[in-house]
Amino acid sequence: MTELEFHIRQTRHLIDNQPEVISLSRIELSDDGAGGQAAGEPTDLGPQTVRIIGILGTPRRMTPDGREVIVNKSVLGMPDLDIAVGDTFPLAGYDYEVVMVSREPTWRTIAEAAEHA
């Protein structure tokens, strides 16, 4: 077993130990013909199994549109998790917005999410 295979297996174990199924929604932006962008209709990406991890403290992030938000949750997924900044998902009665995605190291995907107002 290679080191990469070992780490991928460990990521799978962490997720399977405390799985959460979330349904991400994504709004694609397109050229509006006037030099700007227009939001399309939300696309449901379907259920995806991840591990949700609470955040200690109140880390803050700036969103691409300039908002400062407090990160409430981390989302741990497999390397092929279909998740992007701006995606939203409901969890335990709250709506969350993905504000950061990292695919490094290559054996996992980690995202940060903020409660969406």
Per-segment meaning from a language model:
Residues 1-6, 16-117:
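Short, conserved turn/kink motifs that form compact alpha/beta structural patches or helix kinks used as
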